[in-house]
Amino acid sequence: MTRRAICFDLDGTLVDSLPDIIGGFRSAIAEQGLPVPGADEVRPWIGRPLLDMFAALAPEGDAEVLSAAYKRIYPQRFTQHTRPFDETVHVLEELRSRGYLLAVTTTKHSPMARDLVTALGLADLLDHVQGTDGFPAKPAPDVIERALSALDAEGTWMVGDTTHDVHAGAAAGLRTYAVCRPEATHDRATLASAHPDRLEESLLPLLDLV
């Protein structure tokens, strides 16, 4: 029997982590004495590689130095406000009960992603946590392909909250499910422009599709 897997982005999809990510990003910039962008300026960049984010939002600084500062600051606060979304545990438990393998496919590096899902009590509900470790980030499909290879499974859906997730899922040959929450990284119009197979306001409707 073919093993079936569903891939999930982490931040903004399974967990409400944007305040801690934005706070860490702004703190890293402030620490270097640079002009600090507002939260609304940072939000659309979440899910992109750190070097790209810092180059765009703190062009006066050294992106390598700022990235190193973020990697030091963020783990100290990454569960200060971060919590799973209300439906996350229920949806993951239900999908596992239906025989699906569940993977996180995130732009975070794998060790940080594993630390976060463990701290939030989600590790036992996930079969694999795949970060972006030295290969092209989403919208490239590499992180999804590596997760599916590790699971030796056929991918069915890619679930995420950004256009990068949608494009990566489509490039990997998966159906795509975009989540547009009130404080989403990308707004509904932006997500719709990527043409996901489904565009919903939470994870719950996914249960009617599998």
Which residue stretches match the model-derived regions?
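Active-site neighborhood of HAD-like aspartate-dependent phosphohydrolases
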Residues: 1-44, 56
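Conserved Lys-Pro-Asp/Glu-containing loop-to-beta segment of HAD-superfamily phosphomonoesterases
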Residues: 5, 138-166
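Conserved phosphate-coupling serine/threonine residues in phosphotransfer and NTP-handling enzymes
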Residues: 13, 106-108, 180
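Metal-dependent phosphoesterase signature
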Residues: 55-90
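Short, acidic loop-to-helix structural element flanking the phosphoryl-transfer center
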Residues: 76-104, 110-114, 141
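Acidic, Mg2+-coordinating phosphoryl-transfer loop and its flanking beta/alpha structural elements
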Residues: 158-197
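Short acidic-hydrophobic, aromatic-tinged amphipathic segments that line or gate anion-handling sites
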Residues: 198-202
